[in-house]
Curated annotation (Swiss-Prot):
SUPFAM superfamilies: Head and neck region of the ectodomain of NDV fusion glycoprotein (SSF69922), Virus ectodomain (SSF58069). The chain crosses the membrane at residues 492-512. It comes from Rinderpest virus (strain L) (RDV). Residues 1-19 form the signal peptide. This is Fusion glycoprotein F0. Residues 109-133 are annotated as: Fusion peptide.
Amino acid sequence: MGILFAALLAMTNPHLATGQIHWGNLSKIGVVGTGSASYKVMTQSSHQSLVIKLMPNITAIDNCTKTEIMEYKRLLGTVLKPIREALNAITKNIKPIQSSTTSRRHKRFAGVVLAGAALGVATAAQITAGIALHQSMMNSQAIESLKASLETTNQAIEEIRQAGQEMVLAVQGVQDYINNELVPAMGQLSCEIVGQKLGLKLLRYYTEILSLFGPSLRDPVSAELSIQALSYALGGDINKILEKLGYSGSDLLAILESKGIKAKITYVDIESYFIVLSIAYPSLSEIKGVIVHRLESVSYNIGSQEWYTTVPRYVATQGYLISNFDDTPCAFTPEGTICSQNAIYPMSPLLQECFRGSTRSCARTLVLGSIGNRFILSKGNLIGNCASILCKCYTTGSIISQDPDKILTYIAADQCPVVEVGGVTIQVGSREYSDAVYLHEIDLGPPISLEKLDVGTNLWNAVTKLEKAKDLLDSSDLILENIKGVSVTNTGYILVGVGLIAVVGILIITCCCKKRRTDNKVSTMVLNPGLRPDLTGTSKSYVRSL
């Protein structure tokens, strides 16, 4: 039943079937969609420990490399000591909280507390990172066990399993070079050359370590490292590292492209020269029904002015709902849009009307200089503002002109198979749009200003008008106050006086009218004295009546 309803809905409303964005009307004002993708959000990460062993095992060539090793240790100390001091400043001021139950007087772990008075100044990010750092740190027994294991291994990648804990992966970026190149060549090379070769390799490795952890010297507690950045310190074989860490699945490529695998420094040992990292591997959760659309705008001309429609770069749709989309925490991959946090937030009703096809709700702004797209390829057709850019049919060599009553030109294969626009030659396909958009056919939206200077000027004008309106309101309030101050008696006297004047005026007008009527009758009798009726043979009573 639900499937049947959806099919009927799609047939009766085709725009609803393909989404709530009215691409047909938007294309008339130069807005086209350039792509759509699913929406995935990173959820809670799983953590695993990774150890970077900075000092290789040189037992086989120890006699030839003492000088180079001493210099290498000195260089490592310049990087490791500041990081160790910053980590200790946070971790030594974080204490576990223990609570006692009311029924049984035994203590149990309840959380951690930060000694803010001893720490002094710390940002919210540093405090949060410090708490997470404390929770992911190894205990002293695990550290000592790790040291013993690292001293005996001579492998580039070693899986170290500790009692009661998960596997720890230890990596040494120079060990393969020592095992596979220097040790076999000990019989052919002099001791001095072996030392020089190792010194150059260690110096290069130190440079990679410095470029990786150098930015962390400023704030090693909250600094995060991507797995791509770690690849050099891990010997360059990132695929082998990911395999050892157990990272696989269909989302691995998407997570790598979005740089979702992060590492944070949790421990630094300046005696044994190793760094412990906590690797966070997120899982992806696809939000069903949400589609992220990417938009582009093409400028159009109204007379001599060039405009473009102001719309967001990305929007999201889910059913009938259209929302804004913040692409800042997101990465766009072939598998979809991957965000580290929710990037959808509400859109104003007016802008939603714009996307649903009401072009009068779409704001527009002037194009400044040469900024803005003047052509774009959509559905194989070229949508161009040929009033602002030269459009030429490459096939015939003729110029494609745009009449003043047109705002955009749509070029397809039936008009010109190969088009040259803006110095670019494009082969277009069959027609998907009308040949042009006429100005009288479009209800354009209100003009707005986006430049800081224009916005400031418009704001100053608005403030000036508000000040003038305020002055007028103050004047009207003053007049109203004066009217309220007049007493009721004075008002009554004024009304009585006005009434008497009106009555006297009416009487004077009435008398004047009567006098004028009498004067008219007298003048009529004087002007016709000879007109007398013939009364011969008429009775006296009739004459008297006359």
